[in-house]
From Swiss-Prot:
Post-translational modification: The N-terminus is blocked.
UniProtKB keywords: Apoptosis, Calcium, Cell adhesion impairing toxin, Disulfide bond, Fibrinogenolytic toxin, Glycoprotein, Hemostasis impairing toxin, Hydrolase, Metal-binding, Metalloprotease, Protease, Pyrrolidone carboxylic acid, Secreted, Signal, Toxin, Zinc, Zymogen
Enzyme Commission number(s): 3.4.24.-
Protein's UniProt name: Zinc metalloproteinase-disintegrin-like VLAIP-A
Residues binding Zn(2+): H339, H343, H349
Originating organism: Macrovipera lebetinus (Levantine viper)
GO terms (BP aspect): apoptotic process; proteolysis
Amino acid sequence: MMQVLLVTISLAVFPYQGSSIILESGNVNDYEVVYPQKVTAMPKGAVKQPEQKYEDAMQYEFKVKGEPVVLLLEKNKDLFSEDYSETHYSPDGREITTNPPVEDHCYYHGRIQNDADSSASISACNGLKGHFMLQGETYLIEPLKLPDSEAHAVYKYENVEKEDEAPKMCGVTQTNWESDEPIKKASQLNLTPEQRRYLNSPKYIKLVIVADYIMFLKYGRSLITIRTRIYEIVNILNVIYRVLNIYIALLGLEIWNNGDKINVLPETKVTLDLFGKWRERDLLNRRKHDNAQLLTDINFNGPTAGLGYVGSMCDPQYSAGIVQDHNKVNFLVALAMAHEMGHNLGMEHDEIHCTCGAKSCIMSGTLSCEASIRFSNCSREEHQKYLINKMPQCILNKPLKTDIVSPAVCGNYLVELGEDCDCGSPRDCQNPCCNAATCKLTPGSQCADGECCDQCKFRRAGTVCRPANGECDVSDLCTGQSAECPTDQFQRNGQPCQNNNGYCYSGTCPIMGKQCISLFGASATVAQDACFQFNSLGNEYGYCRKENGRKIPCAPQDVKCGRLYCFDNLPEHKNPCQIYYTPSDENKGMVDPGTKCGDGKACSSNRQCVDVNTAY
């Protein structure tokens, strides 16, 4: 266990019960005034670097409802990637990308001492601002703007006066991303070794946030103000997702200060569609990442606060969400973004039987004044089911040393420039190959982790580190010179597979039969050819692609590259032409790119049935 030296700074703690006050969050009816007492916590023998403004670990003491509270904070070292970038635009439209220094940032997460279920997300840039959970209840804290005073207000969000408007909701109306099979826990599933390894591996979401022009105007045309707000939001996201073994690294922030790059409209489905296409066409070509979220201050139609594609993580167009900056309290905006990202990760809206130990959970369809940062049992199981079935690969990859937004910080579990390894804090590290205090290898060690590292030594050259996953994949071998398994290699695209029923595409063999089984269950088969003629209609039941929200009919030769038609073979169903359709994710149920659509032909990415040699 990490030993700490406690250096007390003498600041009295005088709780004061107030009746009403105007704070950044609005008019608060019930609050306490506290004077946090700082207790600096450093590992025994550690010395704070003179150029370091913000310590890696801090403690604060104050009282809530007359009871002492000890707030334990650690710098959120996963917040940024090493080459974190910010993009804005010059008056003549030129792209300006910078890499601001973010090594010594002031964003922390933590917990309350002696409260196992507690958590905290705090900005310590100018006093303490953020939230903490104490005994199952969520409190907000922010400094009072008084001269020469350390006074802070502590209050519950439910005590902030609300504007007279309908509660904000998520725009997703039907969230099933695949068949309505009963959800089972991992212990109930017959998982393959590959699925079990995938499920137990930590996940890393490399995130880019885009702030639109109306956000730029809302915050006084200040890039710094927008940056600060988004940093605080991502800090909260990290606390929320850490319980799922998911780490969120901010790779980039883009601000549309010279006008929007898409039409940001009140109609959420149109805006999300345009944003996803812009991400695939433009943003991904400039900045490789896993997920993008658009933050806007436009009023969406109705009480909608956001919208996200369901079960879409890692998809170049659909791994995206849009969120309204609907509240002064950044905690509430972070909850909305966590909710939409939850949809990207396969989670549906909570139903009445779902529970998280609080009055409202992350995936509730309505944002509540009693909102919590907890995922319900339903969300956890749906997320697990999505991971097992889809195994999105991009989130397995740690951010590269050259990708992580913040320069190297030892102890954040991310190996960054200048580090050999990173096993967490000295208190948490259990890796004998890595010195947790220095993030350097221990004497005699060649490596600390990786598929080609065994007991601190490189595995012998030729050792299989990634077995072939099917006939379109190949086994990858250790080189004997590195702890990392080489880049995943596949059979060439277009090679026949599955007894000539398909063609290899990016290591898989996409065939319609398997896609129907995934959507409708084990008894499903591909529908008769005549059903695919519906794809010439150009409506939700059949089309090939969308342009500016309009569904484009398939040309006669392309009908097998549009909507997938199946038959579930269940006795109660007589319709031989069945499709999977959900308005919130119309892409679900389309024929997968690379699927065979005729002899020597495969579906291209723009849903045309072309010669297999040109399809990829």
